[in-house]
Regions:
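Helix-loop-helix connectors at the membrane interface of multi-pass transporters/channels
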Residues: 1-3, 76, 109-140, 240-244, ...
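Membrane-interface "cap" regions at the ends of multi-pass membrane proteins
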Residues: 1-30, 59-64, 68-81, 85-92, ...
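Membrane-embedded translocation segments of transport machinery
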Residues: 2-5, 9, 169, 173-322, ...
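Inter-helical loop and helix-membrane interface segments of multi-pass membrane transporters/permeases
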Residues: 3-7, 34-39, 69, 74-93, ...
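Loop-to-transmembrane helix boundary motifs in multi-pass membrane proteins
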Residues: 8, 14, 22, 146-147, ...
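Select transmembrane alpha-helical segments in multipass membrane proteins
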Residues: 8-19, 44-47, 86-99, 146-152, ...
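Transmembrane helix-boundary motif of multi-pass solute transporters/channels
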Residues: 11-51, 238, 249-252, 256-259
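A generic transmembrane alpha-helix motif of multi-pass inner-membrane proteins
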Residues: 378-402, 423-454
Length: 454
């Protein structure tokens, strides 16, 4: 399949917004702000920026290089550079990882849609116990979560079958600006609440006394996972880049957008939480239990405004989830239609149906039945563990070794400098990082997940 009939991004802004949309996800909302607030505020953010420069951006550029050079799905892109060696299996690992993540990530994405519906219907009003029970009852229901998982897959499927320009790029040009507009509206509303300044201070006041080994390790982990490295998304989208795309500048712009969304999410969450004396947590419980309670209390005197803010928040989450799901879906769609030599619609249908089945089983494992739990862990949690803690760091680690030590330096330099049309002053630094620094940092991230450093 040639590059001409694969499609490509039609504009620079479309390329940036689509790829940034793949990186921006629910983790920007439920993980980064909490981590920043707990681990030194602006001090953590500075450490995180350093981690992005040392690890996130070099890894992203590496996947850009492999993807654009291959001009094909992720597995084939690695195969083209591997010359028949075992390195090709790194590409297949990324496709497999993306496939598994697509299935269970859609479950949480479906929860966001359910909460949009619940906000519209006013179902989230009540005391903290009611809201907590609402989430528990919904997530363990055998029907509704599966229904919403299928719903978000159908939305994603509709985008994907329209191709790169007519689907992914066109949708991203709408959804990413909408995401920022919604973020800004909620940030303004939250910051106007009484005692909101305490929440802003919690997030942004630098406390360098908290900066220790764990802060550095957590910042490294966040910078790695937030860039969507190791799951094929970056490599697949890069296969649609033109030869004129500046890979370093694109990676820098995407990382800035990703950080900006995360910081704005913190400015949305903490002022509202502190205004009612609630201590925010992280993970799904933050967005599906804590924040509905915060909105109920913070806007108790203005129920209509509270209804609007709650609705906008879950629309925002749904948009963030959908842009990530689109990139994951495309990893697998491009793989199936190119490797099986079928059209895009058939490839997308294979992904939608198979991943919806995976999602259904993952959803059912969260309380509807105990037959989908193994060794005390639900199937959903097993998918999260295997992909997040093993496959992603392994794929990232091997990609650094592959590009840094196996792929001919001239190929890497040609891609980095757009075949000599860019000066490429930073190429030497990039190559040093990807050969010697990034593999070590990813290995530290891997060990830290298992509590090796305490």
């Amino acid at each position: 399949m040639t590059d001409s009939n694969r499609g490509s991004f039609g504009s620079k802004i479309g390329l940036i917004l689509a790829t940034a949309g793949g990186a921006v996800g629910l983790g920007n909302v439920w993980r980064f702000p909490y981590m920043a607030g707990q681990e030194g505020g602006a001090a953590f953010i500075l450490v995180y920026i350093g981690s992005v420069l040392l690890l996130g951006i070099p890894c992203m550029i590496s996947e850009f290089i492999i993807g654009r050079h291959g001009a094909s799905n992720t597995a084939r892109a690695y195969t083209k550079l591997s010359n028949g060696t075992a390195w090709k299996w790194v590409g297949y690992l990324e496709v497999l990882t993306g496939f598994l993540i697509t299935g269970y990530y859609a479950v949480v994405s479906g929860w966001c849609l359910q909460y949009v519906y619940a906000s519209i219907m006013g179902e989230l009003h009540g005391d903290p116990t009611f809201v907590a029970n609402y989430f528990k009852e919904f997530s363990s229901d055998p029907v509704r979560p599966v229904m919403w998982t299928v719903a978000i897959f159908l939305i994603c499927h509709f985008v994907i079958i329209h191709g790169v320009r007519g689907g992914i790029e066109k949708a991203s040009k709408v959804m990413m600006p909408v995401l920022f507009i919604l973020l800004l509206i909620i940030v303004v509303a939250a910051c106007l609440l009484p005692d909101a300044g305490k929440g802003v201070e919690f997030l942004l006041k630098p406390d360098f006394g908290k900066v220790d080994r764990n802060v550095f390790l957590n910042a490294l982990g966040q910078s790695f996972y937030s860039m969507s490295i190791g799951m094929g998304c970056i490599c697949t989208y890069a296969s649609y880049f033109s030869r004129q795309t500046n890979l370093f500048k694109s990676a820098l712009q995407i990382s800035i957008i990703d950080l900006l969304v995360a910081v704005l999410a913190g400015l949305m969450i903490f002022p509202a939480a502190f205004s009612v004396g609630v201590s925010p947590d992280s993970g799904p419980s933050l967005i599906f239990i804590t924040l509905p309670n915060v909105f109920n209390q913070a806007f108790a005197s203005l129920p209509l405004l509270g209804w609007i803010i709650s609705l906008l928040f879950y629309v925002l989450l749904s948009v963030a989830a959908l842009t990530s799901l689109m990139s994951l879906h495309e990893v697998n769609t491009s793989f199936f239609y190119e490797e099986l030599k079928i059209d895009r619609k058939k490839g997308a249908t294979i992904v939608t149906v198979s991943c919806a089945v995976i999602g259904a089983f993952c959803s059912l494992s969260l309380g509807a039945t105990d037959k989908l739990s193994f060794f005390g862990k639900a199937l959903f949690d097993w998918f999260d563990f295997v992909t997040g803690q093993i496959f992603l760091p392994l794929a990232g680690f091997l990609t650094c070794l592959f590009l840094g030590w196996y792929v001919p330096k001239q190929i890497v330099q040609d891609e980095f400098t757009n075949w000599g049309t860019l000066k490429g002053r930073l190429f030497g630094i990039y190559l040093f990082l990807i050969k010697f620094v990034c593999p070590v940092l990813i290995f530290l991230v891997f060990l830290n997940q298992f509590g090796v450093f305490g």
